[in-house]
């Protein structure tokens, strides 16, 4: 660890702003990387996201992870949100493939409990060509089984962007799965801001932002809200594209992140950046942006010249990308209106997910 971290953690923030960190060279390094980036929470992969089977942790590495958490004041039960592998699909109608997913899923949960981690983020998967309701029941059955086979880790289901037959593109999907879970203290929800917007839930204005969270509370309930993934969206509302953008440069804009930094119901849970950066400096700067937004009242910010300048600058930086995605979206809309057939998407990760971002990081920071 350098004698002085690149970004100093805020000791006064009510919000656990953080980012997805690399665990290259040992899972304990994710803690050090989080500290040096100024994170108050963090995410990481528990093992290689490209392989079904990875070497188990040594006791030395487990002890080092726990020691680092204690040294840098992270509570692994509440501040760490590992991300599950993207190819885990417990809703797969092919039971052989679903069982293979379950083995990798259970390996992740066991790793969490070895490290003392209390939260685990999971993409709910895809029903593919199966019956939607039957596959939701299958997913819930696997989750119930996993909960019985582990001791304390909470499974946090992430909402999705709406492509193909992905589970979790609607809040109702998540409600139905939660309704089938026997021990509800072991299940939660992570709301991804990009996925939410892409799935057709408008959160870009004060009115629609508040309406979404009211709907979330009515359908699911705030008691299940366990984490947030913080991303802007390159694609327009309802595009069903999982395209993460840097904060303020996408269709959400800085106003949404201002509202997040003043939402009481988001206090005390991991709020984790998954924006497209090739190194951790970008994450550190965005954490400081969120803490700056938190430090001023909303009324002050709306009258603040610096706030307006930041908004204008960020929107200009993302203008080209937004225009490209809008053009693609409009072409697809015209094809749909004309009855052109299109292939259904499956639960494969998008080109802009965390895995691809971590791959880019390897070009600048060898893992």
From Swiss-Prot:
**Bias category Basic residues: which stretches?**
333-344
Q: Which parts of this chain are annotated as the region Disordered?
A: 312-367
Q: Where does Zn(2+) 2 bind?
A: 158, 192, 229, 274
Residue positions where Phosphoserine is found in the record: 356
> Which SMART domains does the entry mention?
AP2Ec
Q: Extract the GO molecular function terms from the UniProt entry.
A: 3'-5'-DNA exonuclease activity; 3'-tyrosyl-DNA phosphodiesterase activity; DNA binding; DNA-(apurinic or apyrimidinic site) endonuclease activity; double-stranded DNA 3'-5' DNA exonuclease activity; phosphoric diester hydrolase activity; zinc ion binding
Full protein name? Apurinic-apyrimidinic endonuclease 1
Top-level taxonomic group:
Eukaryota
**Residues holding Zn(2+) 3:** 195, 242, 244
Where is it mostly found? nucleus
**Residues annotated to bind Zn(2+) 1:** 83, 123, 158
The entry describes its oligomerization and partners as:
Monomer.
Which keywords does the record carry?
DNA damage, DNA repair, Hydrolase, Metal-binding, Nucleus, Phosphoprotein, Zinc
Give a yes or no for keyword Lipid biosynthesis in this entry: no
Q: Listed GO cellular component terms?
A: mitochondrion; nucleus
Source organism per entry reads Saccharomyces cerevisiae (strain ATCC 204508 / S288c) (Baker's yeast)
The UniProt entry, under NCBIfam families, shows: nfo
Stretches with biased composition (Basic and acidic residues): 321-332
Q: How is the cofactor bound?
A: Binds 3 Zn(2+) ions.
**What other remark does the UniProt record contain for this protein?**
Present with 7250 molecules/cell in log phase SD medium.
């Amino acid at each position: 660890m350098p004698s002085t971290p690149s970004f100093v953690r805020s000791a006064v923030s009510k919000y656990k702003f953080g980012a997805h960190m690399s665990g290259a060279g040992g899972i304990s390094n994710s803690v050090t990387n989080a500290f040096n980036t100024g994170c108050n929470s963090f995410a990481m992969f528990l093992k290689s996201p490209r392989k079904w089977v990875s070497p188990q942790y040594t006791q030395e590495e487990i002890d080092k992870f726990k020691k680092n958490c204690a040294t840098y004041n992270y509570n692994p039960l509440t501040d760490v949100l590992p991300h599950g592998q993207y190819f885990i699909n417990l809703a797969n109608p092919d039971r052989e493939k679903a069982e293979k997913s379950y083995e990798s899923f259970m390996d992740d949960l066991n790793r969490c409990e070895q490290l003392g981690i209390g939260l685990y983020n999971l993409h709910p998967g895809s029903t593919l060509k199966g019956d939607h309701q039957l596959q939701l029941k299958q997913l819930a059955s696997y989750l119930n089984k996993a909960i019985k086979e582990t001791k304390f880790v909470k499974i946090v289901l992430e909402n999705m962007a709406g492509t193909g037959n992905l589970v979790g593109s609607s809040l109702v999907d998540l409600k139905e799965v939660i309704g089938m879970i026997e021990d509800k203290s072991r299940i939660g929800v992570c709301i991804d801001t990009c996925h939410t917007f892409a799935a057709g839930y408008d959160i870009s204005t004060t009115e629609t932002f508040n309406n979404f969270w009211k709907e979330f509370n009515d359908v699911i309930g705030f008691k299940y809200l366990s984490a947030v993934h913080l991303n802007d969206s390159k694609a327009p509302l309802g595009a069903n594209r999982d395209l993460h953008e840097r904060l303020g440069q996408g269709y959400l804009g800085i106003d949404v992140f201002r509202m997040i930094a003043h939402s009481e119901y988001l206090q005390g849970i991991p709020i984790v950046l998954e924006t497209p950066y090739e190194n951790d400096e970008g994450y550190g700067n965005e954490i400081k942006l969120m803490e700056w937004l938190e430090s001023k009242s909303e009324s002050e910010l709306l009258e603040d010249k610096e706030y307006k300048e930041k908004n204008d600058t960020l929107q200009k930086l993302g203008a080209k990308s937004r225009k490209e995605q809008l053009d693609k979206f409009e072409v697809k809309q015209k094809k749909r209106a004309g009855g052109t057939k299109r292939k259904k998407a499956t639960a494969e990760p998008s080109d802009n997910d965390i895995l691809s971002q971590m791959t880019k990081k390897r070009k600048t920071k060898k893992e």
